[in-house]
């Protein structure tokens, strides 16, 4: 029986030029929809239409500045002309839907972008969907009313029937007061502070009365709890994250469906060409990537060198040396992700570069405009890069999906060192694996499942005991592991190629949205 799924997400990264995403959550949403289209599933998606995107990162005098991310949405999206309205703060707000149809291998998925930038609305209401993750509590709740309640209304106006409403994170939880049909919920937040909560006073003021009357809550409305209470199926995004979520929300059944990435999107051309030539059907069945074991080592090595050259051309100055070991680190710049951990002992880093005839590190990542600590970390990365003599550090300004593909494929090692317990899943290491790039990471999120020591990558701080100085222990471990890794890379080429193959055959073949979607089909949309 065909199942109609409507997938709601505050951000969706379907293509780099459609600027309705900020990072991992949006790209995961896009990858999920691509997998649905590849399998010809009846999926529809709903998000907001951010005319000013997230923001454009500009580096001036060693500091991050933000500019609007204006983009030509009117050329990229189709104006459906279909409208609905929702009450926000006592006012009727008009919403129009724009559409983008993503063509997959065996079907297409329609994505609807909700826009309040209409002449019928006041100037303040026009701005409600203008930019992603901006404004205070009031603006955030207004966006969530538009996404959840407005989105459910829009689907009715469009004549789209839905069996399952899938809420990708709690932002769309208010759809539970509007939409009929089964609800599915995926939480991505591993720490209590990350869950959206709104005061009773604000909720009573902002929400439409008929929807408000369906809510039963105390002094504040927790969107994660609202979604959990109204869903037939809920899940976290890795085994560990599901455990943490069950501890945070006792009394709720929370399953684990570990995230994945869309294999065809995240395999750079030298690797996708290699797979096309040797593995029939891998694009719709990436489990077949286990067959990479049968491809000649020299071809895998050649594909990596081509990716490295592409990355060099992609960098503004193009000075990346093909022969030198290169590390990549790119993600949102925020304190728990510790982008400056590798710089804790500059002398140690310099000596590694001396011993192995050079070291290159490529960085990328934006800090949220209101995250002063995150912005400070961007400045610190830039400052440290100037202090090093033997280590060449590159920073990619205004990091995007395009930059991400060049980086995960063009570096030799992917570095990820979040503080433990703060990473729900993480997906950049999965993208790296599709391009034969092993990961060095703290044991957290998906890496607890994906790391086979010395085979697919390495762990940082394995002997860490809670309560100890995490930064000190992890930085010491990081340098020790780099010594081991760089030694293999420079002196044991065959072993290194074996590790590259393992990344593809063991991790890329499993940590993909094809496998992930099949798990949702079996457990959530059944």
Model-predicted regions and their roles:
Residues 1-526:
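Catalytic cores of carbohydrate-active enzymes across secretory and cytosolic contexts
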């Amino acid at each position: 029986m065909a199942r109609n799924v409507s997938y709601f997400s505050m951000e969706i990264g379907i293509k780099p030029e459609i600027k309705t995403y900020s990072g991992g959550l949006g790209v995961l949403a896009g990858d999920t929809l691509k997998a649905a289209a590849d399998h010809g599933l009846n999926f529809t998606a709903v998000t907001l239409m951010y005319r000013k995107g997230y923001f454009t990162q500009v580096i001036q005098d060693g500091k991050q500045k933000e500019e609007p991310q204006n983009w030509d949405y009117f050329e990229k999206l189709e104006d459906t002309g279909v409208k609905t309205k929702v009450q926000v703060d006592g006012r009727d707000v008009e919403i129009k839907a724009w559409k983008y149809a993503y063509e997959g291998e065996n079907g297409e998925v329609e994505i609807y972008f909700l826009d309040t930038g209409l002449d019928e609305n006041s100037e303040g209401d026009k701005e409600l969907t203008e930019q992603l993750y901006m404004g205070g509590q009031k603006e955030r709740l207004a966006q969530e009313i538009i996404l959840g309640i407005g989105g459910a209304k829009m689907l009715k106006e469009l004549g789209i029937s839905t069996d399952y409403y899938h809420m990708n994170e709690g932002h769309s939880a208010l759809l539970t007061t509007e939409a009929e049909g089964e609800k599915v919920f995926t939480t991505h937040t591993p720490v209590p502070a990350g869950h959206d909560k709104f005061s009773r006073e604000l909720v009573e003021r902002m929400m439409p009365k008929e929807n408000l009357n369906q809510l039963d809550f105390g002094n504040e409305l927790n969107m994660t709890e609202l979604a959990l209470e109204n869903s037939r199926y809920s899940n976290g995004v890795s085994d560990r994250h599901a455990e943490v979520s069950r501890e945070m929300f006792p009394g709720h059944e929370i399953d684990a469906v570990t995230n994945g990435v869309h294999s065809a999107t995240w395999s750079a051309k030298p690797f996708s060409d290699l797979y096309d030539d040797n593995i029939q059907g891998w694009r719709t069945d990436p489990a077949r990537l286990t067959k990479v074991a049968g491809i000649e080592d020299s071809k895998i090595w050649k594909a990596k060198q081509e990716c490295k050259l592409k990355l060099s051309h992609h960098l503004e100055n193009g000075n990346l040396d093909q022969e030198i070991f290169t590390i990549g680190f790119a993600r949102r710049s925020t304190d728990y992700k510790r982008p400056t951990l590798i710089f804790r002992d500059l002398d140690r880093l310099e000596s590694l570069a001396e011993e192995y005839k050079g070291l290159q590190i490529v960085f990328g990542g934006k800090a949220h405009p209101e995250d002063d600590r995150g912005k400070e970390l961007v400045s610190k990365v830039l400052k440290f890069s100037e202090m090093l003599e033997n280590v060449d550090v590159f920073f990619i300004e205004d990091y995007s999906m395009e930059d991400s593909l060049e980086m995960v494929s063009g570096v030799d090692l992917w570095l990820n060192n979040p503080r433990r317990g703060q990473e729900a899943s993480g997906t950049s290491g999965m993208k790296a694996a599709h391009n034969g790039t092993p990961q060095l990471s703290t044991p957290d999120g998906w890496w607890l499942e994906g790391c086979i020591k010395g085979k697919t990558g390495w762990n940082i701080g394995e002997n860490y005991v809670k309560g100890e100085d995490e930064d000190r222990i992890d930085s010491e471990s990081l340098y020790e592991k780099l010594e081991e890794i760089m030694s293999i890379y420079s002196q044991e080429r065959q072993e290194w190629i074996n590790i590259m193959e393992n990344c593809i055959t063991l991790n890329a073949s499993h940590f993909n949205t094809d496998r992930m979607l099949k798990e949702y089909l079996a457990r959530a949309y059944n």
